[in-house]
């Protein structure tokens, strides 16, 4: 293995980590906007139909990524 190959892969991981972090921050911001909109309009915070849709989507994503999709969903729930 060449040092340049290792550096290239590490750089790719660093870029991926930055992208993941930015995407999660964007998702969190959108979630806060939804929470505020629901509060403003007097809409209950929990929509069981939407939550079921989200769970189904993450279950489908988990088929290809193992527990990663569920870990992301759980993180999003804890940090909303």
Regions found by a protein language model. Name each.
Residues 1-80:
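Domain-level signature for soluble enzymes in the chorismate/prephenate branch of the shikimate pathway
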